A protein has these predicted regions:
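N-terminal helix-turn-helix DNA-binding core of bacterial DNA-binding proteins
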Residues: 28, 32-74
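N-terminal leader segment of winged-helix/HTH proteins
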Residues: 1-42
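Short amphipathic alpha-helical segments with heptad-repeat character
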Residues: 20, 24, 28, 72, ...
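A structural signal for well-ordered alpha-helices, especially hydrophobic packing surfaces
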Residues: 27, 59, 115, 149-152
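Charged, amphipathic alpha-helical coiled-coil/dimerization segments
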Residues: 2-8, 83-143
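Exposed, interaction-prone assembly regions rather than primary DNA-binding/catalytic cores
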Residues: 139-155
Length: 155
């Protein structure tokens, strides 16, 4: 049974405010649990997973600046994570063809194999954490959040 808003006669702005707070709380709880599981089960971090995920989608690599833009973090954060991935043999950096000043980061075959293990665990954890949503609920929430994102992007 889905709980209803506390007061259905209140202004929609109040309901939207509570919705925003609920989204933040749920997102924070999920993120904290993912961080904990990555640390405990793989001795790694969520930001490291995020960098590996971005690099896994670009087999030819990504410029460091594009990687930081994609992940919406500073160049310094990305550089530190890529440095550690490189030290561990999971990534490498090469000069960008045509611009030796720019570097492209990409996963090594070992890094790709590690990422696939992390990604499988990540998907399983999220499936477990969101098991309270049936298929229809998950699709509806996904579509509504997509609609909201599109409306914000259009502003």
């Amino acid at each position: 049974m889905i709980p209803q808003p506390k007061n259905t006669s209140e202004p929609i702005s109040k309901t939207r405010l509570r919705l925003w707070l609920k989204l933040l709380k749920a997102s924070s709880k999920i993120e904290m649990e993912l961080r904990r599981r990555f640390r405990v089960e793989f001795a790694t971090t969520l930001p490291r997973f995020d960098v590996m995920a971005a690099l896994s989608r670009k087999p030819n690599g990504l410029k460091m600046s594009n990687l930081s833009d994609l992940l919406r973090v500073s160049n310094g954060n990305v550089t530190g994570i890529v440095d550690r991935l490189t030290e561990d043999g999971h990534a490498l950096r090469v000069a960008m063809p045509g611009d030796r000043r720019a570097q492209v980061a990409r996963l090594t075959p070992e890094g790709q194999a590690v990422f696939l293990k992390l990604a499988a665990a990540h998907e399983g954890w999220l499936d477990e954490l969101l098991q309270g949503l049936n298929s229809g609920d998950a699709a509806t929430l996904y579509n509504l959040l997509g609609k909201t994102e599109g409306e914000i992007d259009a502003q």
